[in-house]
Swiss-Prot record:
Residue ranges covered by zinc fingers (TRAF-type): 122-178, 178-234
Listed InterPro entries: MATH/TRAF_dom (IPR002083), TRAF-like (IPR008974), Znf_RING (IPR001841), Znf_RING/FYVE/PHD (IPR013083), Znf_TRAF (IPR001293)
Family: Belongs to the TNF receptor-associated factor family. A subfamily.
Segments forming domain MATH: 284-415
Any one GO molecular function term: zinc ion binding
Domain notes: The MATH/TRAF domain binds to receptor cytoplasmic domains.
Protein name: TNF receptor-associated factor family protein DDB_G0285149
Gene3D superfamilies, per the entry: Apoptosis, Tumor Necrosis Factor Receptor Associated Protein 2, Chain A, Zinc/RING finger domain, C3HC4 (zinc finger)
Function: Probable adapter protein and signal transducer that links members of the tumor necrosis factor receptor family to different signaling pathways by association with the receptor cytoplasmic domain and kinases.
A single cellular component GO annotation: nucleus
Record key words, sorted: Cytoplasm, Metal-binding, Repeat, Zinc, Zinc-finger
Top-rank taxon: Eukaryota
């Protein structure tokens, strides 16, 4: 629709006091934001001229040269109040489009109201002469733009007006001619086989039992390819020795499918068991640590206060996203246990208390003589956990006892983090 300025709608011309002293347009052309700004000496300009003037390097009133800033302009409330009281025609008195650049009054169909400028916004929202689009759908091409008070007349010819179907009461556009023929579930139709009349919603249930409908033998899967009307089904099934051969074919096919299903089930069961084992082992770690040149390490790491921090350590390893290693004191961790081998498990990161189950085993060439110990404990304060007196040195280091083989000592270890399940609680 054409945009109208207030100056286009004035009933009477206004005095110069309501015009901008620079461009001579009205001080405000918009009805939704009427604001008259003035310089400190009372000179009034429209908002566009004030903006241009302040964007100029001089930033001054064009009349009195007073320095101004947009945010510091004062409002002329008297002029604003007087301006709002002036009379204008409703913009819907005019035709929607200009002709030759001019607005044209619609003497026959336009709004005849004369209102104050301050009433324009409220009036425009409620004016029955306002232009609207057809509310029945964007597809409407016949007079799809009209005045609000012409809606009832428009609906008489609008093919997109939705009216309740006389059978199912569903709102349907008048142009939808196919509704009764293909959609309406409450419309009566005839079965194409037996010609019985029924509601469309009843047809699918009827077709399951219609005696005139042509069907295939229910033993088609077994090889019978005959088609017949449903009412002849009993006679057909009695033929071919009661279809015993076809029934046997179906049984054989089902047996083959059953065997294949059984094989598939066994494969899935095997995969399930494999995955279950992997899940069980995901919280376990086992390995062995081979310490070469063992007897020399026994000599190089004596038990005394000076060397008590010396040890043999295995390479770092990762388990459950944490870094660990194992350390061995060939002659004990402290003088009090100098006759024993000390073994410890270490966690190399700051971590809350972790409950851990682990075992060490010093391997003997005779598996029945291997020395194995288990423990369930917590890591605390970054200290290792293990045994100060794991095994007597003389037992391990005596040649011929089977622990040191080829000057190598082998220590197996296994780590497990027990899974804890919080109890279910209802408050």
């Amino acid at each position: 629709m054409t945009e109208f300025k207030i100056s286009d709608l004035l009933v009477k011309p206004l005095s110069e006091s309501f015009s901008c002293i620079v461009c001579t347009d009205l001080l405000s052309e918009s009805h939704d934001k009427i604001q008259v700004n003035q310089c400190p000496h009372g000179h009034c300009l429209c908002s566009d001229c004030w903006t241009k003037q302040i964007e100029n390097k001089k930033k001054e009133c064009p009349i009195c040269r007073a320095k101004v800033k947009l945010e510091f302009l004062s409002r002329n409330l008297f002029l604003e109040s007087e301006f709002k009281k002036k009379k204008v025609y409703c913009k819907y008195q005019y035709k929607e489009e200009k002709e030759d650049g001019k607005i044209i009054k619609d003497e026959e169909n336009g709004c005849k109201d004369i209102i104050r400028i301050e009433e324009m916004e409220t009036h425009f929202k409620n004016c029955q002469y306002a232009f609207i689009n057809c509310p029945n759908g964007d597809e409407c091409k016949i007079n799809s733009r009209f005045r609000k008070n012409q809606l009832e007349e428009h609906n008489k010819s609008c093919e997109y007006l939705k009216v309740p179907c006389q059978y199912c009461k569903t709102p349907i556009a008048k142009i939808n001619k196919d509704h009764l023929e293909s959609e309406c579930q409450s419309y009566k139709i005839k079965c194409t086989h037996c010609k019985l009349e029924m509601l469309r919603m009843e047809l699918s249930e009827h077709l399951e039992v219609c005696p005139e409908m042509t069907i295939q033998c229910k033993y088609k899967e077994g090889g019978c390819q005959v088609s017949f009307q449903r009412k002849h089904q009993a006679n057909h099934l009695a033929s071919e020795n009661n279809h015993i051969g076809f029934i046997q074919n179906i049984i054989d096919q089902h047996r083959i499918l059953l065997d294949e299903s059984d094989r598939c089930f066994k494969r899935l069961k095997c995969s399930h068991e494999t995955l279950e084992k992997r899940l069980t082992n995901i919280n376990k770690y086992s390995n062995q640590w081979v310490i070469e040149n063992w007897m020399q390490k026994v000599i190089d790491i004596p038990n005394d206060e000076v060397t008590s921090t010396k040890r043999v350590s295995c390479p770092m390893f990762y388990f459950n996203s944490r870094k660990y290693n194992v350390s061995c004191f060939p002659n004990g961790f402290t003088p009090a246990n100098k006759d024993y081998i000390s073994l410890y498990l270490h966690l190399h990161e700051a971590s809350p208390n972790i409950n851990i189950k682990f075992s060490f085993e010093i391997v003997n060439s005779d598996p029945t003589k291997s020395i194995k110990k288990e423990k369930n404990s917590y890591f605390q304060n970054d200290k290792g956990i293990g045994w100060e007196k794991f095994a007597e040195c003389k037992t391990i280091n005596t040649l011929g006892e089977g622990f040191v083989v080829g000057n190598k000592l082998t220590i197996k270890f296994e780590i497990e983090i027990p899974q804890t399940i919080d109890p279910l609680t209802t408050k």
